[in-house]
Amino acid sequence: MTPTRQSLASPPCSPLVAALFVQADGCYSKLPTVDAWPESRDARRYAGPLPVVAHPPCSRWSRLARFCEVRHGLKVGADGGCFEAALRSVRTYGGVIEHPAFSKAWAHFGLPRPDTKHKGWTAGACGGYSCYIEQGRYGHPVKKATWLYVFGVSKDKLPELRWGHTPDSRGTISKNQDWRGGMDKWRDSTGHRAANATPPEFRDVLLRIASMANA
């Protein structure tokens, strides 16, 4: 019997990792091996069973959060329970949380604080690991200093990342631009969507880490 075009097609892939708190049409949305949870699905309700890559909202935990509280009354940590839910998912199903470096959520939830000068992973009493990494080394237009928290992956399986600082702190922004304003200035001129976007190469690193959880 001659096989039909449908029978020759590749079988559909089942999701291997859940991506929580992501943009609806962002870099995770069309990956067949990823179960994407944008705002419309409310990732706080995620109940497994897949390991996760979590990008919980960061504005209430950033280095400017205290200023915003004083100036605008927006309380530090008042994110509707998003970070707490992300942490619960990571500790229950394994995976990784991505947040801006110096996020106040680390101290609030007792996570191991990375050292910006340490090229490697920092172990915590909880059994997880944190690290400092700059997304500019993975294609982001500015350095985008980042902290990661991983749970459910043994130390010997944690990958070596591109440690260290992005050359001249400018990421891939064109060298003919005098860009010394950093992430905040670039976000103001370009928009939060571009600033918050995860470079595809860095996304793949996070997915690889999550896929090793509880293996």
Describe these PLM feature segments.
Residues 1-215:
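Class I S-adenosyl-L-methionine
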